[in-house]
Amino acid sequence: MTTQEFNIALTHEAISEALADREAIVWRDRRLTYGDLTDRSRRLATYLHRAGFGVRRERADLAPHESGQDHVALYLYNGNEYLEGMLGAFKARCVSVNVNYRYVADELRYLLQNSESKAIIYHSKFAPLLAEIRDDLPEITLWLQVADDSGEPLLPGAVDYEEALASVPADLPDVGHSPDDLYMIYTGGTTGMPKGVLWRQHDIFMSAMGGRTPGVWDPVTSYDEVVDRAVNGMGGVMLMIPPLMHGAAQWSAFILMHQGAKLLIPDENRRMDPASVLRALEREKASTMTVTGNAVMRPLLDEMKTEKYDLSSLTIIGNGSAIMTEELKAEVLDFLPNTLINDSVGASETGAQGSHLSVKGATSTGRFGTGPGLVVLDVFMEKLHEPGHEEPGWMAQSGWVPLGYLNDPEKSARTFPVIDGQRYAVPGDRARLLESGEMELLGRDSVSINTGGEKVFVEEVEKAVASHPAVRDVTVAGRPHERWGNEVVAVVEFVEGASATEAELAAHVGKALAPYKVPKGWVMVDRIQRSPSGKADYRWAKKLAAEAAEAAGGAG
């Protein structure tokens, strides 16, 4: 590993000094240069610093699961303010906290309390919900409200975000920025309560924010090299579709900035609107676009096929966090034959781990080339699997990995075990290490289904169901069964104007999977519920499956 360690605030400062006039963010009528972003993030940092926020205890005085910095919650839709919020927090030696803007009051209260947030930056649209729970959040003493088109007035005691920035100089606070400063990302809470994953900034920079050369994996060795890569790199324009409140989107955005490229945000930032996405792509000639599986790519492709848009600039579609089936990839690449699809694998607890490229005529899903430190541990977490080992194990990552979960030493010890002197991150994904050295990702153990003593990975079933031409989207969950313990249930959304019977769907899946993996229950819905980033909502699917059984007189 490199001996030079990095701080994200300082990497941004160094790049911005060299690229002050280059555009960094484009959203609606806003066109911010790297210099503009530096000015605004410095002002936010100064405002936070003058308000008394920053570092309380240095890393050397803390346990791995502890934070010694003040936390700033970002309760925002995509926009320039989100990245300003992250950078401003880092430059004040605070820690940004990602807040899911779909949360209801109880979920929002839990996250803001659990994260120990001391300040919050939020869009005006969210002011009424915050007002409901504000009395339960006495630790939050600074409320910065970002104006939007909702017409909601300032909360009592809140400060308008733009007025706050205008009230202070654009100075970088002299606070002793350190590679030990924290980056924190809250997990989605898809299968349990959200948890704050703590990373050293140097480690997340190396793991997932552009500190290494993709494919080659060589780490940068100096700030001068970081600047040189940004000045002389590929540049380009990346269209950001997933919400920046999710880790993968944040990592993509920071990789982009560390390449000196431009981040493009669709005009419609509250939902995925295919027309808004493609209008932005055409207008700014975006070269890269990020998506999250079939749920995002299918409606985009349908809109592309109206042939209203010039898509000739698009060369790479980056996919992560959800499955894009081989069938849909082939359809996309038939329509866009000069485009590549890059699947990435990783988790909040591991950073970026591997990738796979699909091109016209050669598509696959679920297998990835492995990066340094990516291994498979046996089921007892005692030894490593060799390539070609038939049994699945735990996908694990060594090297640059997180410190732990905020204020949870027990969970931290389970997820980040030390084996033969090496520390690993083991977030719960099952995988096989193939003879070729590729990784075959099977799925998240926490949402697997045990039916009749056999383990079924829902992602494998979802992939098979989604390959049916009538299926637009699918989520698979388990529900109690008197005989088998649990049975596999598929919640299905059809393509508009298409349909299939349960028997037809089961027969289709049975061609690809063993009988015990074929769904025994089917629930047809108008729309699959997903997170804003496109991730499956397994709690919703499980509840729906159980309700369907009750309505039918009980499962089994």
Describe these PLM feature segments.
Residues 77, 122-132, 150, 242, ...:
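Adenylate-forming
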Residues 30, 47-103, 240, 315-439, 444-448, 455, 461-462:
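Conserved AMP-binding/adenylate-forming
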Residues 167-186, 192-193, 198, 228-238:
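Conserved pre-ATP/AMP-binding loop-to-beta segment of ANL
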Residues 74, 120-122, 282, 289, ...:
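AMP-binding/adenylate-forming catalytic core of the ANL superfamily
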Residues 91-166, 176:
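Structural core segment of the AMP-binding/adenylate-forming
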Residues 33-35, 182-218:
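Conserved AMP-binding A3 loop
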Residues 206-288, 303:
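Conserved AMP-binding/adenylation subdomain of ANL enzymes
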